[in-house]
């Protein structure tokens, strides 16, 4: 425990970013950590919280939510990820075009119209012709609907992946009570110990 206390009360003479391990001359208030765990470059921390693997935008030690501002990249600078594209989008779009073309051709076919208007055409033949048109038409409508849903999902997923979180400092809270400082220090030391040493059995 003495090691943890020394780490919490570490001097800021040799300031070093805890992410890149490079020199850091300015200590900003991004969370409620103290000591060397508070020393970090803004660029390093922003790059860290913008990675896909980081889902929780809060400090891993003190669990303080970062003050981040969400922005979207310009549409011309979006990066599209192939894994975000749903497989059905690649299947439904060509299917919609192919079946739609067949349905359109069937609808405007002169020969079919003539057969439908002919008195010699049996009722069974007319039913078959109507069914042969309605079948592809229904498939076309369903495929188009599914394609629209997949396109919307792909757009929202791509937009989320092209989101930039800009980091800002926390606002000073002058209303905190000094009576809870001892408890906060103890919880903070336990959190640092668990991250560095590992959870106790």
Swiss-Prot record:
UniProt keyword annotations, A-Z: Host endosome, Host Golgi apparatus, Host membrane, Host-virus interaction, Inhibition of host adaptive immune response by virus, Inhibition of host MHC class I molecule presentation by virus, Membrane, Metal-binding, Modulation of host ubiquitin pathway by viral E3 ligase, Modulation of host ubiquitin pathway by virus, Transferase, Transmembrane, Transmembrane helix, Ubl conjugation pathway, Viral immunoevasion, Zinc, Zinc-finger
Chain residue ranges for the region called Disordered: 168-188
Example GO BP: symbiont-mediated perturbation of host ubiquitin-like protein modification
Cell compartment(s), UniProt: Host membrane; Host Golgi apparatus, Host trans-Golgi network membrane; Host early endosome membrane
Residues on Cytoplasmic side: 1-92, 145-201
Annotated GO MF terms: transferase activity; zinc ion binding
Binding site for Zn(2+) 1: 17, 20, 41, 44
Broad EC category: transferase
Descriptive protein name: E3 ubiquitin-protein ligase LAP
């Amino acid at each position: 425990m003495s090691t943890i206390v020394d780490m919490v009360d570490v001097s800021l003479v040799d300031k070093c970013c805890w992410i890149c391990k490079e020199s850091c001359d300015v200590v900003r208030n991004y969370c409620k950590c103290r000591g060397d765990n508070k020393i970090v470059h803004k660029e390093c921390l922003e790059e860290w919280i913008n990675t896909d693997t980081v889902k929780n935008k809060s400090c891993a030690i003190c669990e303080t939510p970062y003050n981040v501002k969400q922005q979207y990249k310009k549409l011309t600078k979006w990066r599209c990820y192939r894994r975000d594209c749903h497989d059905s989008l690649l299947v439904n779009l060509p299917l919609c075009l192919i079946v739609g073309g067949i349905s359109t051709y069937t609808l405007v076919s002169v020969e079919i119209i003539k057969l439908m208007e002919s008195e010699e055409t049996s009722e069974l033949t007319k039913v078959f012709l109507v069914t042969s048109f309605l079948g592809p038409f229904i498939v076309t409508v369903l495929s188009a609907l599914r394609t629209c849903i997949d396109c919307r999902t792909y757009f929202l997923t791509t937009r989320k992946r092209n989101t930039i979180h800009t980091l800002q400092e926390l606002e000073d809270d002058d209303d905190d009570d000094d009576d809870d400082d001892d408890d906060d220090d103890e919880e903070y030391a336990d959190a640092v110990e668990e991250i560095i040493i590992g959870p106790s059995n």
